[in-house]
């Protein structure tokens, strides 16, 4: 119940523009390692590997609200685990687009039908009601993710194929 109230409070502030974005420079690789550390136990329980899709030998510095981007990454990696297949994967890749970094989170889970893709960022929308009930959650996570990315003046995109998996992509500005 507390989680639902916190999610509703977050999304209300995001939608109204009340939530301020606190831009700081941070290492996206390190933040993703922290997300993987937090998610590892659940991933192990479900037989899902957490991987980097690109080389991460050096820091990738971005300018963004670190707390909010941690929330975005936790949500997207968590969903990849939650809706993943046994012996599946969640991969995070980073791609340099000159002034921005493209972040790509891919899983080989249950995927979504193209008709659902238009609605997944809506409040309380759940693709598969029976599976969602089994997995828990508030139905607010992807709506919050979208608002956080938009508050950074960026967009989030999704591609998915049923029974093949899902890929979310968004960009963040490089640290100056």
Question: What kind of feature is each model-predicted range?
Answer:
Residues 16-21, 59-64:
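Conserved micro-motifs of the catalytic ATP-binding
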């Amino acid at each position: 119940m507390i989680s639902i109230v916190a999610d509703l409070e977050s999304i209300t502030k995001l939608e109204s523009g009340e939530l301020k974005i606190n831009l700081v420079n941070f290492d996206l690789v390190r933040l993703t390692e922290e997300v993987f550390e937090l998610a590892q136990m659940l991933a192990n329980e479900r037989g899902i590997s957490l991987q980097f899709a690109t080389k991460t030998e050096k820091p990738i510095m971005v300018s963004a609200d670190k707390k909010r981007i941690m929330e975005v990454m936790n949500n997207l990696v968590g969903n990849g685990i939650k809706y993943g297949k046994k012996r599946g994967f969640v991969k995070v890749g980073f791609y340099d687009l000159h002034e921005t970094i493209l972040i790509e989170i891919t899983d080989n889970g249950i995927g979504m039908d193209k008709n659902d893709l238009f609605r997944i960022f809506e409040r309380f929308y759940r693709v598969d009601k029976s599976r969602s009930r089994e997995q828990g959650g508030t139905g607010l996570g992807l709506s919050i993710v979208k608002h956080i990315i938009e508050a950074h003046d960026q967009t989030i995109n999704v591609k998915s194929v049923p029974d093949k998996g899902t890929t979310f992509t968004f960009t963040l500005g490089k640290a100056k």
